[in-house]
Amino acid sequence: MATSIDIREEAGVRTLHFGSDWIQGAMRIARPWNLELDYTREMMTSLLLREDSRYPRKVLLIGLGSASLTKFLYRNYPLAKLDVVEIDPGVVAAARQFFKLPDDPQRLHLHISCGADFLLNTGKQWDLILVDGFDALGRAGVLDTQTFYLMCRAHLSEQGIMAVNLLGRSRGFKASVERIREAFDGRALCFPSCDSGNTIAFAAAGDAVETSLLDLKDAARELKERTGLNLLPTLTRLEQAQTCEGGLFTL
């Protein structure tokens, strides 16, 4: 799939665009390994949901963009093996040239494919699946279907978590959330929208997730100390929105 790729810079931030003003990824030039956009940080809440200190060991990222999530996991989780699926080789080239995508075939495997086709033709499982794939108009296409979410579930390990970037202000948002819930037998939770309008949905397979917001805050402090990523504002917003019934994050 050929995409019109634009690279822009303003106030020290480099952004990726697919022929429109829609931001497909961003990198602060002085801190290329950090997560610049709010929704990418919120997707990393998934790292707090399993107590195993080695989690995640196997990660699948569908949609490369500016490689923000890929770079963060690559740098901060050196034991993790990363599979990245991107439909457009031009996006991969842009990520390498402008966004410092690492070249490490031992740990980072790039697949030029549609995410749905890739899942259909592999028997692998992952501890964490991150879905963030849109076209120039913000459409996820086949990556927002019941069949796709069922495939994601089938490819999760017993510790498996899926995090999906949805557009909370889009007309089909509620239908997207319902598709995820149905695919995961109700084991899904949706965060309140970021200021950008992005909403992150989480779903789980295998072992149950049941942890208090207090425990999540403790885990967030440890993550901040280790990686510099501060998820405490995200958890505070989650608490204020009363998203977690009884103060429990359950999947």
Language model features: what each stretch is:
Residues 140, 146-210:
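C-terminal substrate-binding/active-site "lid" region of AdoMet-derived donor-dependent transferases
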Residues 1-11, 15, 23-32, 38, ...:
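SAM/dcSAM-binding transferase cores
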Residues 79-81, 105-107, 159, 185-187, ...:
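A generic structural signal for alpha->beta connector loops
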Residues 22-25, 134-137, 162:
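A short, flexible beta-alpha/helix-coil linker loop
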Residues 139, 166-170, 243-251:
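Alpha-helical subdomain
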Residues 9-11, 16, 33-158, 196:
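The AdoMet/dcAdoMet-binding core of the Class I SAM-like
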Residues 45, 75, 97, 117, ...:
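Charged/polar, solvent-exposed surface patches and flexible loops
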